[in-house]
A protein has these predicted regions:
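N-terminal glycine-/charge-rich "phosphate-binding" loop or analogous flexible N-terminal tail
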Residues: 1-52, 268-282
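Rossmann-like dinucleotide-binding domain for NAD(H)/NADP(H)
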Residues: 99, 177, 181-282
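A short, aliphatic-rich alpha-helical micro-motif
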Residues: 48-49, 67-70, 148, 216-217
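Oxidoreductase and adenylate-handling cofactor-binding alpha/beta cores
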Residues: 111-130, 167-174, 241-254
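Short gly/ser/thr-rich secondary-structure transition/capping motifs
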Residues: 34-40, 57-58, 133-141, 182, ...
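Structural motif corresponding to alpha-helix initiation and N-cap regions
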Residues: 20-21, 39-46, 60-64, 85, ...
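Rossmann-like dinucleotide/phosphate-binding beta-alpha-beta segment
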Residues: 5-6, 21, 29, 136, ...
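Phosphate/diphosphate ligand-binding glycine-rich loop within oxidoreductases
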Residues: 53-129
Length: 282
């Protein structure tokens, strides 16, 4: 018989917000217990969340091995939209819901950041700043710079964020292309003079120890920011509130608002119930 008096537990596997006050207020108000950790490996996740009823993760990997070790987990919530840190197929096989935060939580922030990187790269802002601080007061430091108006901006996709970037770019007189063939031509023929990146391949925030050895850091025509495009105080509050509220909804018997595998888990549960019913004595 299930223990209906047991207090359910939520484990925040990792976070870099400085505190969990927002999450704690939401989770404890629902009568749930909150435990926090700073997991940097699947072993860390297993140690922290083996008996948890729910997990919230920012960067920590919750892979198949960790999922198979979970004894009570009902839901894994991601701080953010992408769920690449979670093995969704493994979670589905174990009947665990995986939730995310719909993309509009930081749509404007990412579009603004992309335009900031574009403008900084196009106008050689970093190069000018470094030269000026070093005592070099010459406009020629940035040569060559070309006007944006009449130029072309290539987008790798044309989802909501890309469309928001396109609207902003149009205000600067840029022609927007979202054609793979056109973008390939621009890249392969060397039309692109610089790059603005909000992350690098190794995603330093996921690593226990990191040193800036990526060769991109040695290029003066590349601007790199630390996966910060989504950031604004308002966006951070939204993502934390939504993730915490999702686990509360699931653990209190309500449907989540943004489950990436909700249909599959519901189908698997119905199939399991049917098998139990078919095998029950008459």
């Amino acid at each position: 018989m299930a223990d209906t008096t047991r207090q359910k537990t939520v484990v925040i596997a990792d976070y870099d917000y400085g505190d969990v006050d927002i999450e704690r207020a939401i989770i404890e108000a629902a009568g749930l217990r909150l435990i926090t950790a700073q997991c940097k490996s699947e072993d860390d996740v297993i140690a922290a969340a083996r008996d948890a009823d729910a997990i919230i993760a920012q960067y920590a990997t919750v892979g198949a091995r960790a999922i198979s070790a979970l004894t009570r987990c009902e839901v894994i919530a991601r701080y953010g939209t992408g769920t690449d840190i979670v093995d969704v197929d493994a979670a589905t096989q174990h009947g665990i819901l995986v939730t995310n935060v719909p993309n509009d939580w930081c749509e404007n922030e990412v579009a603004d950041h992309a335009m900031a990187l574009l403008l900084a790269a196009a106008r050689k802002i970093i190069r000018y700043d470094q030269a000026t601080r070093a005592g070099v007061w010459r406009w020629q430091t940035g040569e060559p710079i070309h006007r944006l108006s009449g130029g072309t901006l290539g987008l790798l996709s044309f989802g909501a964020i890309a469309q928001a970037i396109g609207r902003r770019a149009a205000g600067f007189g840029l022609r927007v292309i979202a054609s793979d063939q056109a973008l390939f031509k621009a890249l392969s023929q060397g039309w692109i003079a610089g790059a603005g990146l909000d992350d690098i391949e190794e995603e330093p925030a996921k690593l226990r120890d990191w040193t800036p050895a990526n060769p991109l850091f040695g290029l003066d025509n590349v601007i790199i920011t630390p996966h910060a495009a989504y950031y604004s105080e308002e966006a951070i509050r939204t993502v934390r509130d939504f993730a915490a509220s999702e686990v509360v909804r699931v653990l209190t018997g309500q449907p989540p608002l943004s489950a990436v595998n909700g249909v599959q888990v519901a189908s698997a549960r119905r199939a399991a119930d049917s098998r139990l019913t078919a095998g029950a004595p008459t």
